[in-house]
From Swiss-Prot:
Pfam families: Cation_efflux. One of its GO terms (molecular function) is monoatomic cation transmembrane transporter activity. The chain crosses the membrane at residues 165-185, 194-214, 241-261, 286-306, 333-353, 356-376. Belongs to the cation diffusion facilitator (CDF) transporter (TC 2.A.4) family. SLC30A subfamily. This is Mitochondrial metal transporter 1. The gene is MMT1. It is a multi-pass membrane protein. One of its GO terms (biological process) is iron ion transport. It comes from the Eukaryota. Disulfide bonds: none annotated. Residues 130-141 have a biased composition (Basic residues). InterPro entries: Cation_efflux, Cation_efflux_TMD_sf, CDF_Transporter. Mitochondrial metal transporter involved in mitochondrial iron accumulation.
Length: 510
């Protein structure tokens, strides 16, 4: 509600809700025509003539009020206020009446005097209490994050969990197919890939666990939420991915250098590797070309699940889903290596292509796993989001726009300034810390604690509505330093530096 008061002759109005029409008070309404509308008296029901007169008088007053409203709506100043009120992006606060209000000056405690008794003596029309206006709806232009769900039923329905369950089912089918295919078609490459598919199921289970727990609500014990659980899951999945790459590379390297290294050393090194061992003995066991169909089907399934998981990971800003997506891509590449090994071994009997392909694939695997591990570790130790990150730029722009449109008790003719913005990642969620610079006021105007509370509440509402994964926002206020104060501080610093230089110079000569 906004109350506008001007020195008499004046029009006192009340704006309730956002609409062009106004509710004009019946008590002491003064308009430019000099007509004064008094509060209607109690209708005397005993005298029909008086009742009729009172009804006619009320009708006449209503017509006068409607005419006054129409006249006011034509006023350019009113239209400007109504347009600002309809913008949804402002806050109306109490206008300072004196320096001796019940408030605390920012940065120092000065002129702090209680004025509750003075406020009690003032008429209610002058007690313009601070408030924000709230509409029955909010506007959110950011994409909804399906991982930010609240109930167990919603967790089961969100896209991240669904695609992980699909990936788990695909891994089970691939593991069974490759296991029996390796036995039936005498393919050691398929059999080794089946063992790797089993490790993928462990990765999927870790992803399901971390995504489900990270979606829980913050509690008193965990006020920042459970987003870090997803980060830990991302670290575990990325570690498994990197270890698989090292294992494949190690086995391929052993197979590649086998002809120039004694057989006993190769056997010892090969036993240290993963089940992905593409040595000469394995290639010699590939005798049935039909095993290639299983490898080709695995490539198609894994590539599809990679693209689907990666798309959802980007939409939900989920590192653990992204790590799991790359795990699917690695599986398709290892299946490609198996396909090449089966085909070349059967058709042209070129064994070296398999080992070289294994080294290339292992390099891609280690790169993807290492990057995922680095991102997870940086997030766990609370590295801030970089300033060129799209998430940072979006929130920074939103804060500045909101501050520029803010109508408050600030009379410096320039808005609050954004001095510092810090964003921290917590799984799919974000935590923010704002430092706002309050400009110097004119005419001894003192900003109250109540104003800062309302500005804080307004900023939080705007940002959490526009950025769905912003779970917590802390706001700090600092006072702007004037030019003389800055020059004085700078002069003191220069003086101290000169003294230190002279002192060092004297000690050197001594």
């Amino acid at each position: 509600m906004l109350r506008i008061c001007v020195k008499r002759p004046c029009i006192k109005i009340v704006l309730s809700q956002v609409r062009p029409a106004l509710l004009v008070r019946k008590e002491n309404l003064h308009i430019s025509t000099g007509v004064k509308v008094e509060k209607s008296s109690i209708i005397n029901q005993k005298d029909p003539n008086k009742v009729r007169v009172e009804i006619n008088e009320l009708k006449r007053q209503a017509e006068i009020e409607k005419a006054a409203i129409k006249e006011l709506e034509k006023n350019p100043q009113y239209q400007k206020l109504a347009e600002a009120f309809n913008s949804h992006d402002h806050v109306h606060l109490r206008e300072s009446e004196t320096e001796q209000n019940d408030i605390i000056s920012l940065g120092t405690i000065r002129d702090y005097k209680s004025s509750k008794c003075e406020q009690a003596d003032k008429p209610s029309s002058l007690n313009l209490h601070s408030h924000t206006h709230s509409h029955g709806h909010t506007h959110s232009h950011a994409a909804h994050n399906p991982l930010l769900v609240l109930s167990t039923e919603q967790i089961r329905k969100n896209a991240g969990v669904r695609i992980t369950w699909v990936g788990l089912g695909v891994n089970v089918g691939i593991a069974i197919g490759k296991f029996f295919g390796g036995i039936v078609f005498h393919s050691q490459a398929l059999f080794a890939d089946a063992i790797h598919a089993i490790s993928d199921m462990v990765s999927d289970l870790l992803t399901l666990l971390s995504v489900g727990l990270a979606a829980n609500k913050p509690t008193a014990d965990y006020p920042y939420g459970y987003g870090k659980i997803e980060t830990v899951g991302s670290l575990a999945v990325s570690t498994i991915l990197a270890m698989a790459g090292i294992s494949i590379g190690w086995s391929s390297l052993c197979a590649l250098v086998g002809p120039v290294i004694p057989h006993t050393i190769i056997d010892t090194i090969g036993n240290l590797g993963h089940a992905h061992t593409y040595s000469e003995d394995i290639i010699e066991d590939v005798t049935d070309i039909n095993a290639a169909w299983i490898a080709a089907a695995s490539i198609a399934a894994k590539e599809w699940i990679f693209r689907a998981t990666r798309k959802i990971a980007i939409n939900t800003n989920s590192n653990v889903l992204m790590a799991n997506a790359w795990h699917h891509r690695v599986d398709s590449l290892t299946s490609l290596v198996a396909l090449v090994a089966i085909s070349t071994g059967y058709l042209v009997n070129i064994q070296s292509l398999d080992t070289i392909g294994g080294l290339i694939v292992s390099g891609l695997i280690i790169k993807a796993g290492g990057e995922g591990m680095c991102i997870a570790i940086k997030e766990l130790i609370d590295q801030s989001v970089s300033r060129d990150d799209p998430r940072y730029l979006e929130i920074e722009t939103l804060v500045k726009d909101t501050l520029n449109k803010l109508i408050s008790n600030n009379n410096s003719q320039k808005p609050y300034g954004l001095k510092e913005l810090t964003l921290l990642s917590s799984g799919p969620n974000l935590r923010g810390h704002l430092t706002l610079e309050v400009p110097l006021q004119k005419w001894g105007n003192i900003l109250g604690v109540n104003e800062f509370e309302i500005v804080t509440h307004h900023l939080r509402n705007v940002l959490t509505n526009e950025v769905s994964n912003l779970r917590r926002l802390d706001i700090e206020y600092v006072e702007e330093k004037n030019g003389e104060e800055n020059e004085h501080i700078k002069g003191q610093q220069n003086y101290k530096e000169d003294v230190l230089i002279k002192h060092d110079h004297t000690n050197t000569h001594i």
